[in-house]
Amino acid sequence: MVKQVIVCRKLDIGKGKLCAQVAHASLDAALKVYRNNKELFDRWYREGAKKVVLKVNSLEELLDIAKKAMEKGIVVSIIRDAGKTQVSPGTIICIALGPDEDEKIDQITGNLKLY
């Protein structure tokens, strides 16, 4: 069981802001799974709540991954910034997939590199 957060490298934002957005994505996706499939959430949590942060080079690639995950029934959380500090309102910063089965998520993200 794994949850993956994928970040678009192209954005010019500070490390602290990036960390906060990754945390938002991770929490949002976990809560979605908790509400809709508590058994899956509980198993992921019991197994150590594994999380991995990966990177892509473009917004298009990020959105393509989100679309493929949704088509496979994987929970997706898309994080848009409020735009109060470093980026324009609504800028997509990252997405989170899962938690779900490793094999299911790896079919979509297995070629991505760690952030």
From Swiss-Prot:
Any one GO cellular component localisation term in the record: cytosol
Superkingdom of the organism of origin: Archaea
InterPro entries hit by this protein: Pep_tRNA_hydro_II_dom_sf (IPR023476), Pept_tRNA_hydro_arch (IPR034759), PTH2 (IPR002833)
Gene Ontology biological-process annotations: translation
Entry annotated with the keyword Cytoplasm: yes
EC number(s) reported in the record: 3.1.1.29
Subcellular compartments: Cytoplasm
Predominant subcellular localization, coarse grouping: cytoplasm
Coiled coil (residue ranges): none
A Pfam family: PTH2
One of the record's GO molecular function terms: peptidyl-tRNA hydrolase activity
Catalyses which reaction(s): an N-acyl-L-alpha-aminoacyl-tRNA + H2O = an N-acyl-L-amino acid + a tRNA + H(+)
Alphabetical UniProt keywords: Cytoplasm, Hydrolase
Function: The natural substrate for this enzyme may be peptidyl-tRNAs which drop off the ribosome during protein synthesis.
Family of the protein in this entry: Belongs to the PTH2 family.
Protein name in UniProt: Peptidyl-tRNA hydrolase
